[in-house]
């Protein structure tokens, strides 16, 4: 009897595995990025080739609940003088998540994510990366609320780099000279509580973030964000947000962002403004968590000690070609004495040759008050999915 039960269990397991694999989806992508960057008269080559593979196993008939994994390999050659190593090989686990949806009523649902998946704060500029954790979200017509917690110490710092608080004695552990495919990242525990209340065509957003530092610096960061977004008219939207950050409750800094977008058929025109505090009055320098550079200058510039005002236009031609252009003015706000820092522009196009093949060309240039910061970047990007 016991042998028959084992055989039955084995047969059922094989049938279940076969059905699961038959229902599974898979695919991949190849990217080739050829970049020339540096001083206008001495551009240097930066070559980046990547291959990624993904697999998805549905766990429900509607395909809203699923298991998803994505791995990638990148080869990078960087001839710039600022590069510590010319050649880098990078292996990464981009996604490894279980995603589940439960419909609670015709107008409400519950979502649970577990594993490694990307997430971003409300501004999209402070914490925008993957991490290993849990995300629980409840959404209805009257309210949306979520909780989040994760750990960053198992990430590959060659892919996701977090900014250290050097004043607290911690340096980034990303060492580009290493031959390792995978270098463990800085250790933080991000936690978050998010609330969104829709009313008419508007949204009120309230977020609280904490980043518990498990590195030697023990510099814990806490953020509170308040935002409003929605439509002023049928074709005009806005998004206004401000965030206050404290480090170990010993300092206060601010990051504020405003955006207006006008939609006219296939054309979008956007105006934006950004303030990231420096040593301005009672404010300390604002330091985001994820490394992200808004200025195209020769020296990396984070969202800290700057004021940026910009305009951007996007035009879609026959749903095949997207043409875009934008320009920004940057003010140096690292001290109380505000000073003009520079002007930058970006322009390019995305051409969908086929549904699974895209060619992009992008030009970016920064003109600084200090000419040592001047930089030109030219990119040709080929992306293919299969």
Which positions does each model-derived feature cover?
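Hydrophobic h-region of N-terminal signal peptides that target proteins for export
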Residues: 14-22
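Sec-dependent signal peptide hydrophobic core
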Residues: 9-13
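Well-ordered, non-membrane alpha-helical segments in soluble/globular domains
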Residues: 46-52, 185, 189-190, 257
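Short, solvent-exposed loop/turn segments at secondary-structure junctions
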Residues: 74, 119, 276
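Beta-barrel outer-membrane channel/assembly domains of diderm bacteria
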Residues: 21-115, 134-141, 145, 198-200, ...
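Positively charged n-region of N-terminal signal peptides that target proteins for export
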Residues: 1-8
């Amino acid at each position: 009897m016991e042998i028959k039960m084992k055989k039955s269990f084995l047969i059922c397991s094989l049938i279940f595995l076969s059905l699961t694999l038959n229902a599974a989806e898979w695919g991949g992508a190849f990217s080739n990025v050829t970049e020339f960057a540096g001083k206008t008269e001495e551009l240097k080559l930066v070559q980046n080739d990547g291959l990624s593979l993904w697999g998805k196993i549905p766990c429900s008939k509607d395909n809203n609940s699923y298991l998803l994994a994505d791995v990638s390999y990148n080869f990078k050659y960087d001839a710039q003088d600022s590069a510590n190593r010319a050649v880098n090989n990078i292996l990464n686990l981009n996604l490894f998540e279980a995603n589940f949806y439960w419909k609670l009523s015709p107008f409400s649902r519950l979502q649970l994510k577990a594993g490694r998946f990307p997430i971003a704060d409300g501004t999209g500029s402070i914490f925008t990366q993957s991490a290993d954790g849990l995300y629980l979200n409840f959404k209805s017509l009257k309210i949306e609320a979520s909780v989040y917690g994760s750990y960053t110490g198992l990430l590959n710092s060659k892919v996701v780099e977090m900014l250290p608080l050097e004043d607290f004695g911690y340096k980034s552990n990303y060492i580009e000279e290493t031959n390792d495919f995978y270098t463990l990242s800085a250790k933080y525990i991000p936690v978050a509580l998010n609330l969104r209340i829709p009313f008419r065509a508007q949204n009120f957003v309230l977020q609280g973030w904490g980043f518990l530092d498990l590195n030697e610096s023990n510099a814990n960061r806490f953020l509170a964000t308040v935002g409003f977004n929605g439509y002023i008219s049928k074709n005009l939207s806005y998004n206004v947000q401000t965030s206050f950050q404290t480090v170990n409750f010993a300092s206060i800094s601010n990051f504020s962002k405003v955006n207006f977008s006008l939609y006219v058929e296939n054309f979008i025109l956007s105006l934006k403004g950004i303030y990231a505090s420096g040593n301005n009055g009672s404010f300390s320098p604002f330091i985001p968590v994820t490394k992200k550079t808004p200025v195209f200058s020769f020296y990396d510039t984070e969202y800290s000690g700057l004021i940026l005002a910009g305009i951007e236009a996007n035009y879609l031609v026959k749903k095949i070609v997207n043409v875009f252009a934008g320009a920004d003015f940057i003010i140096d706000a690292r001290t109380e004495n505000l000073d003009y820092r520079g002007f930058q522009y970006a322009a390019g196009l995305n051409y969908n040759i086929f549904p699974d093949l895209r060619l992009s060309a992008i030009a970016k240039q920064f003109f600084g008050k200090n000419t040592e910061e001047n930089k030109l970047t030219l990119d040709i990007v080929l992306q293919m999915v299969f």
